[in-house]
């Protein structure tokens, strides 16, 4: 094995020097604490000479009760990390001034740091809170530690900051319906998000997969709608928030100047509620909460007056818990097929004089009727409605605020129609359940790609609206955290951070003051602050250009190149040990001439490592082709009915065959029994296809598939056992001689992690090692015997 080591030790030395330096105080100064690290970037910042040093007995001066409350909050935070006795008095070295005459926006502040004093001035308690958050970000990142840190000089560089936000609405969406968040997990996010001046949490409390709020008049919502039976057969729940827990969380958020907006989905995405009270749907058939992802066809029936009575009663209880201005009513992804055949819905359309207008069907306008009627009811409580951009398909009242999620178009249409809009488009990076790196090695996600840079570079105000003077209708921006694939809170945080911090800067900082390169630098400081709160944030993984793979075959030699989604050091070992801060640093592609194990990880300036990738490198000889006589195009397939979660369960059946047939395409493995949107009453089965694959030329080939198993030449290449069958994350390569090779493909129809394997297309992909893209194995490559 020959490893290219050019400038390796020089780079290692530079890394160590840049990471560590000394101050006069004798404490080691961390590189991530250098410079100004405030997120989001302030509107105006002037650096000055000197610094303010915290010392034991420091006092925070505040006179009004509102200012004293904020002073007490930050005194506790400072004391927790420093161990200092931090007093709250009328006067102090740190002073909080509420000045009603100050020329600030309601959330604006001035922060003046000198060597002898610190003063925060604002016209509202909210402004004081944000000013103190900025002061804490001038201090070393360890100020957010959960315990005393003794080897830090607690100094803040002298500076003058004048600051206010770009947008009044700066939101993060959280979804406990698909996967629940405990009260403590919600509070943890509130603590962290408030550090970066996020002021709104959109709380998605109801959906097809779960109802998460106690409604006393309808106890079945929580007791029945709050639980589901997963595809694996286990019960999930019952999980929901009691009204007392809701009050506690809302109060906790308000103390940190975060408003919580509840979402009650209407009239679609409510299968959990319908499961508890079947009469809410058109047919009234008994159902259970959805245990798979996607859009449910069974929705509420707007033809029944009892549905509106139900919704109004639920709203009565919810508005008492959420004192904010807005109430989110959903309105998205509502299939209307059942309304077309429902006599009561058609009667409602007739009675209300609803008629198609050339742009909208009667059913779309019936949807608008629901939105308007609920909007009017909420107006009795002085609530303004927010709805997803589908509500524009009808004619919503002009007071409705549109949440544009399918792109900028919804926000543009809203503004042109006189509606305010909140920009939250998935295609533009604001769906944080998207991948943030190579899908081959990142945890399973819904799809898409939303890197930190993509989130950061989003501009919520389309140029079109600026040109016509309608940009004032864009009142804010929000990132969404749909939780289908957030199986626990660690995964949730892995997706939320640090991209939520990029969103915070998009929402607060004027576009002309944004600088992504500097943001990348400041993120290193923010990482340590997140460490203080125990946040499991994303660290970019070492990726192989063209698609990562942990099993590499070669015949003569192979060169492995690595990159990351943003600049970061990589360290590795070749002896099977785990890499660490003292391991060799990757500087150029690594060449291998014999078998080996490469362990490689990303290394932050704080010394924290990413997940370690273990890559098996194997020297192989070309697997000889086999002679096949009397063959036909296609594969032989055997089908066994039943649901098998894994190969062990399948093998226990003795593989009794119910159907023997032949197929022309690999996709027929997953389509033998048609799947449905709901997967109700679909007969599950396992299928094994055997035959041969015709390899066009000698070489090393990578195989990729979402099937359970892919065998080539008697070797198991792709093994997706026990995993969510999406995005083919277990690729493997093999050296093959030109010609025929045995092929076995295994499909198990089941639901794991909310995803039915039946929804996959059954395709098997391959690429030669010198090719950049995978290609589908086509029917002309498949052969079978009689």
Label each residue range with its predicted role:
Residues 1-34:
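Bacterial Sec-dependent N-terminal signal peptides
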Residues 23-167, 491, 507-517, 521, ...:
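Contiguous, structured surface segment used for ligand recognition
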Residues 39, 514, 520-648, 652-691, ...:
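Short, compositionally stereotyped local motifs that mark structural "simplifiers"
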Residues 79, 100, 115, 145, ...:
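Coil residues (strongly favoring Ser/Thr
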Residues 103-326, 342, 373, 377, ...:
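Feature activates predominantly on carbohydrate-active enzymes
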Residues 290-291, 295-398, 405-413:
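Active-site neighborhood of glycoside hydrolase catalytic domains
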């Amino acid at each position: 094995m020959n490893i290219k080591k050019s400038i390796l030790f020089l780079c290692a030395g530079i890394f160590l020097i840049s990471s560590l330096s000394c101050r006069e105080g004798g404490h080691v100064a961390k590189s991530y604490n250098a410079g100004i690290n405030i997120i989001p970037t302030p509107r105006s910042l002037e650096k000055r000479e000197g610094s303010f040093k915290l010392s034991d007995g420091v006092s925070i001066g505040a006179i009004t009760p509102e200012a004293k409350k904020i002073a007490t909050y930050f005194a506790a935070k400072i004391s927790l990390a420093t161990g200092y006795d931090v007093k709250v008095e009328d006067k102090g070295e740190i002073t909080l001034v509420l000045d009603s005459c100050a020329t600030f926006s309601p959330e604006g502040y001035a922060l003046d740091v000198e060597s002898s004093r610190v003063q925060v001035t604002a016209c509202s308690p909210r402004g004081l809170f944000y000013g103190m958050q900025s002061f804490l970000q001038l201090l070393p990142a360890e100020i957010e530690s959960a315990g005393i840190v003794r080897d830090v000089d607690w100094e803040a560089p002298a500076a003058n900051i004048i600051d206010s936000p770009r947008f009044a609405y700066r939101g993060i969406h959280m979804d406990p319906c698909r996967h629940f968040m405990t009260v403590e997990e919600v509070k943890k996010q509130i603590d962290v998000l408030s550090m970066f001046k996020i002021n709104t949490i959109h709380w998605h409390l109801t959906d097809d997969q779960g109802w998460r709020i106690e409604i006393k008049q309808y106890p079945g919502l929580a007791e029945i709608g709050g639980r589901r039976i997963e595809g694996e057969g286990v019960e999930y729940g019952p999980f929901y928030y009691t009204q007392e827990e809701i009050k506690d969380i809302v109060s906790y958020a308000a103390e940190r100047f975060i408003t919580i907006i509840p979402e009650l989905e209407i009239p679609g995405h409510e299968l959990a509620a319908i499961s508890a009270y079947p009469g809410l749907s058109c047919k009234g058939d008994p159902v259970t909460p959805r245990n798979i992802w996607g859009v449910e066809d069974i929705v509420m029936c707007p033809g029944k007056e009892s549905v509106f009575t139900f919704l109004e009663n639920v709203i009565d209880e919810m508005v008492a818990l959420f004192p904010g201005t807005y109430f989110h009513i959903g309105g998205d992804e509502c299939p209307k097929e059942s309304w077309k055949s429902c006599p009561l819905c058609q009667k409602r359309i007739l009675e209300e004089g609803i008629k198609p207008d050339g742009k909208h069907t009667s059913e779309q306008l019936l949807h608008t009727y629901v939105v308007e009627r609920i909007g009017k009811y909420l107006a009795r409580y002085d609530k303004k409605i927010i709805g997803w951009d589908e509500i524009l398909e009808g004619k919503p009242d002009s007071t409705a605020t549109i949440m544009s999620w399918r792109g900028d178009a919804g926000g543009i249409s809203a503004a042109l129609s006189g509606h305010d809009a909140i920009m939250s488009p998935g295609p533009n990076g604001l769906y944080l359940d998207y991948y943030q790196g190579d899908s081959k090695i990142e945890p399973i996600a819904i799809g898409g790609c939303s890197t930190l840079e993509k989130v950061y570079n989003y501009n919520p105000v389309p140029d079109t609206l600026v040109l016509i003077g309608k940009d004032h209708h864009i009142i804010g921006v929000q990132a969404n955290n749909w939780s289908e694939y957030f199986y626990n809170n660690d995964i949730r945080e892995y997706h939320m951070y640090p991209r939520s911090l990029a969103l915070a800067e998009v929402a607060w900082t004027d576009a002309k003051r944004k600088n992504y390169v500097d943001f990348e630098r400041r993120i290193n400081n923010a990482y340590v602050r997140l460490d203080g709160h125990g946040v499991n944030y994303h660290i970019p993984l070492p990726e192989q250009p063209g698609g990562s793979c942990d099993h590499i075959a070669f015949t003569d030699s192979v060169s492995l190149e690595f990159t990351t989604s943003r600049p970061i050091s990589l360290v590795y070992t070749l002896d099977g040990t785990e890499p660490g801060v003292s391991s060799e640093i990757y500087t150029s592609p690594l060449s291998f001439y014999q078998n080996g194990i490469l362990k490689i990880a990303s290394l932050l300036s704080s010394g924290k490592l990413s997940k370690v990738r273990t890559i098996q490198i194997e020297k192989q000889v070309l697997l000889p082709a086999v002679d096949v006589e009397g063959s036909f195009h296609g594969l032989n397939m055997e089908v066994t009915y039943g649901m098998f979660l894994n190969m062990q369960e399948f093998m226990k059946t003795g593989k009794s065959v119910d159907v023997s047939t032949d197929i022309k395409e690999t996709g027929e493995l997953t389509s033998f029994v048609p799947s449905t949107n709901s997967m109700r009453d679909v007969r599950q089965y396992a299928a094994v296809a055997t035959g041969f694959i015709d390899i066009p030329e000698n070489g090393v080939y990578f195989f990729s598939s979402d099937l359970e198993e892919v065998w080539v030449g008697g070797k198991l290449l792709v093994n997706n056992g026990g995993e969510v069958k999406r995005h083919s994350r277990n690729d493997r390569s093999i050296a093959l001689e030109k010609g025929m090779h045995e092929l076995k493909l295994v499909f198990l129809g089941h639901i794991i992690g909310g995803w039915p394997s039946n929804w996959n297309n059954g395709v098997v992909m391959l690429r030669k090692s010198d090719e950049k893209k995978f290609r589908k194995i086509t029917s002309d490559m498949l052969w079978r015997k009689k």
